[in-house]
Swiss-Prot record:
One Gene Ontology term of the molecular function aspect: calcium ion binding
Residue positions binding Ca(2+): 27, 29, 31, 48
Keyword Amino-acid biosynthesis: no
Protein name per the record: Acidic phospholipase A2
Location(s), subcellular: Secreted
Catalyzed chemical reaction(s): a 1,2-diacyl-sn-glycero-3-phosphocholine + H2O = a 1-acyl-sn-glycero-3-phosphocholine + a fatty acid + H(+)
């Protein structure tokens, strides 16, 4: 669920997903189109693609099971669809953490959608 995604971001990145990633670039936040603008925006693009491939459950609403082992998030549970949602969220949170050094709020926070018109790469 989106609430769990926020929790994973807090655990992995030590930042609020709501405040750092809800309106960044062309893909972080609701919707998304155009070409990702930087590495962080690409994390969101890949996350959107990942959610788009999930079938049989609702990535934004359905809860999943995970644990923490040696500081890493480990997705679990018996439902393969929910485990897939967890993996989408886990990979995105790690991607955010790994790209904090290039996060550029001055340029990409509340980035105008008119700048997101280029043809995107395929998922």
């Amino acid at each position: 669920s989106l609430i769990q995604f926020e929790t994973l971001i807090m655990k992995v990145v030590k930042k609020s997903g709501m405040f750092w990633y809800s309106a960044y670039g062309c893909y972080c936040g609701w919707g998304g189109h155009g070409r990702p603008q930087d590495a962080t925006d690409r994390c969101c693009f890949v996350h959107d693609c990942c959610y788009g491939k999930v079938t049989g459950c609702d990535p934004k609403m359905d809860s999943y099971t995970y644990s923490e082992e040696n500081g890493d998030i480990v997705c679990g549970g018996d439902d393969p669809c929910k485990r897939e949602i967890c993996e989408c969220d886990r990979v995105a949170a790690v991607c955010f953490r790994d790209n904090l050094d290039t996060y550029n709020s001055d340029t990409y926070w509340r980035y105008p959608t008119k700048n997101c018109q280029e043809e995107p790469d395929p998922c």
